[in-house]
């Protein structure tokens, strides 16, 4: 039996990044996610070196998030996806955590080594949070050095795989790596990383593939949030108010 899904990585809130371009786009993405079985959806706007989370941007994201939450048929929660950058090492990871959890989503840069990832993940961990490593299977670093996945797992940093890698959308290398990470137990959660209607926030297709390959019992924790405790913990009503920038 297919479980209700928890999707911990999406870009459904218009935030100035490469995700939803406006509220109508975000609503359409959320409605499709709900129809395909998602019960809880984390909106995780990008925090890039060239698109940081200023107080003003945080206010803008929060307003868009609250407006979107009113008009969507699923439970929408807020978090952020961090790209490693030195200034983040001076910030409190709590600001970026997936709402209601101690998890902070961090991506491995697609191109180049993963050096910055380790510094940021260690900073997150030292503050009492868990770094969740986003889509490592899509990165040049893991393709060049497959043992990187073992190093991350040995540190206790869970790996999040993209549905689109498992379905082959990102090419045979990403597909093969994603399946290997599931089969060796390093992949702890599958998420959509949905950006737009041509790359939607839905988990159902990947769930069918994974459950057919490893069985429903093994597949369920990858998709229902229980593997990271994302379903059990409820978010606080709202985050602390942002300051004007």
Language model feature labels by segment:
Residues 31-34, 125, 182-183:
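Non-catalytic positions within long, well-ordered alpha-helices that form the structural scaffold/packing
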Residues 6-8, 42-44, 77-81, 132-134, ...:
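Active-site neighborhood of phospho(di)ester-bond hydrolases with catalytic His/Asp-centered motifs
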Residues 48-51, 83-85, 138-142, 166-169, ...:
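Active-site environment of divalent metal-dependent phosphoester hydrolases
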Residues 52-160, 239-245:
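Extended substrate/RNA-proximal surfaces in nucleic-acid metabolism proteins
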Residues 204, 208-245:
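Mid-to-C-terminal alpha-helical segments outside catalytic/metal-binding sites
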Residues 1-73:
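An N-terminally biased module of ancient metal coordination in phosphate/nucleic-acid-related enzymes
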Residues 186-202:
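Short acidic/histidine-rich active-site segments
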Residues 23-30, 87-90, 115-118, 176-177:
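Short, acidic/polar
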């Amino acid at each position: 039996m297919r479980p209700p899904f928890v999707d911990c990585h999406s870009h459904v809130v218009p935030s100035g990044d490469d995700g939803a371009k406006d509220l109508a786009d975000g609503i359409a993405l959320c409605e499709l996610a709900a129809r395909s079985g998602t019960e809880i959806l984390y909106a995780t706007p990008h925090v890039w070196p060239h698109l940081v989370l200023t107080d003003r941007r945080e206010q803008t994201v929060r307003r868009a998030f609250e407006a979107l939450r009113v008009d969507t048929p699923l439970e929408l929660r807020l978090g952020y996806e961090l790209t490693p950058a030195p200034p983040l090492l001076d910030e409190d990871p709590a600001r970026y955590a997936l709402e209601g959890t101690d998890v902070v989503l961090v991506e491995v840069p697609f191109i180049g080594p993963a050096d910055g990832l380790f510094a940021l993940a260690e900073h997150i961990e030292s503050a009492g949070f868990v770094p969740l490593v986003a889509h490592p299977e899509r990165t040049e670093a893991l393709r060049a050095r497959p043992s990187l996945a073992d190093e991350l797992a040995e540190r206790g940093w869970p790996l999040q795989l993209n549905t689109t890698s498992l379905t082959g959308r990102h090419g045979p290398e990403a597909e093969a790596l994603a399946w290997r990470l599931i089969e060796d137990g390093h992949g702890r959660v599958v998420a959509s990383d949905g950006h737009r209607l041509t790359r939607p926030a839905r988990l159902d297709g990947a769930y069918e593939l994974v459950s057919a390959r490893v069985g429903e019992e093994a597949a369920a924790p990858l998709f229902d949030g229980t593997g990271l405790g994302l379903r059990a913990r409820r978010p606080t009503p709202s985050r602390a108010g942002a300051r004007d920038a």
